Amino acid sequence: MANCSTLVTENSVYNNLLQDKQTTTTNGKYSEVPGFPKIFTFSVGKPLWNKLRYHILVMENLGPDLHQLFHQRKKHFSIKTILMLASQFLTRIEFLHKEGYIHRDIKPANFLMGIGKNKHVVYLADFGLAKRNKEIYNERTKFEGTAHYASLNTHLGISQSRRDDMESIGYVLMEFLSGSQPWDKRNKKTKKRL
């Protein structure tokens, strides 16, 4: 189950990011922005017996994420598939960056395939760690994201910006091309140095 504060952040990003781009249809659902899940509702419930509030974010049903697909295919995608994925990754992240946000958790599990007529559309999801891009340089920033795909600057504690999302996309594509990351095959001593 997702951390409640990340669901609040995710809902806020969806609202701000897609506010002018989604329109309500006659059945009350939002029309989609290509490559971003439709959000149907977000709700904060009353405190439960443990005095914690529950948060609910309801979005459209999507297909498998790229982490699942990559492993189902024995860690092999064709070059053509990787190029098509790269094109859609860059389109999604360009939209996100133009809207003034950075994702901060780019990884295969946060890219999902559509279903039905959208089965070839890659969706970018999980905005629980996203934030407004302020381009403020800081060397004492708390680590946010997934270590395996995080940029070098993120590991060094430098505040994240658009470049870090792009570097993470590069690591994802490198893994799709070779089946692993370069640091997957190194010993613990070398990994620590990296």
Name what the model sees in each region.
Residues 97-115:
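Catalytic-loop of the protein kinase fold
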Residues 123-126:
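Pre-DFG segment of protein kinase catalytic domains
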Residues 138-154:
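Conserved activation segment of eukaryotic-like protein kinases, specifically the C-terminal portion
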Residues 29-78:
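Conserved structural core of kinase catalytic domains
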Residues 1-16:
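ATP-binding glycine-rich loop module of kinase domains
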Residues 154-194:
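Conserved C-lobe activation region of Hanks-type protein kinase-like domains
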Residues 85-86:
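Activation segment signature within eukaryotic-like protein kinase domains
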